[in-house]
Amino acid sequence: NPIFGIHVFLTLVGISALAISAIYGLIYWMFAKQIKSHNLGIIYRGMPPLDQLESMGRLSSILGLVSLGFGLITGHFYAYRVLGELFPPDLKIIINDAAWIFYLLGWTIVKLKNYSGLRLSKLSFWGFIAFAGAIMAANFISSSFHQFN
């Protein structure tokens, strides 16, 4: 079914983009710490400037938010076609929907409060860690029709 394929593709692109944004956030955070201590290692000499890291992180998180959102929407429509429920009571679906809402709220706060730099990088990093941790916990806590054998 093409809807299922679109759902999987968009969801994977979204989660991957959010992971990349978290990695950019971590690099930004570590690089800013090195700059503050005036102790730049050899690894950091080839790094892009902090503002470029920040813009790459912003772009990947926006791509992740949009792609994951459309992936979740197509997943809900596919679930409705197959299961007859728009919101099946599945822990992974609930966590992904909640994570998307939290990312959307996070971006709203970033825009309203004009967060940038270190705050944005920490928010991106810890947001993804919480998201990934919740998904891993869901794998152990409950069974799901999202089993891939």
Task: List where the protein language model places each region.
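Interfacial loop-to-transmembrane junctions
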Residues: I109-A130
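Juxtamembrane inter-helical linkers in multi-pass membrane proteins
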Residues: I35-D51
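Juxtamembrane boundary at the C-terminal end of a transmembrane helix
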Residues: G133-N149
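Short alpha-helical packing/oligomerization segments
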Residues: A79-L104
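Alpha-helical transmembrane segments of helical membrane proteins, especially in multi-pass transport
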Residues: S55-V82
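Transmembrane alpha-helical segments of integral membrane proteins
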Residues: L72-A79, W100-N114
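Hydrophobic cores of alpha-helical transmembrane segments in multi-pass inner/ER membrane proteins
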Residues: L10-Y28, A98-W107
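Short aromatic-rich membrane-water interface segments that cap or initiate transmembrane helices
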Residues: N1-G14, P48-L59, L86-I94
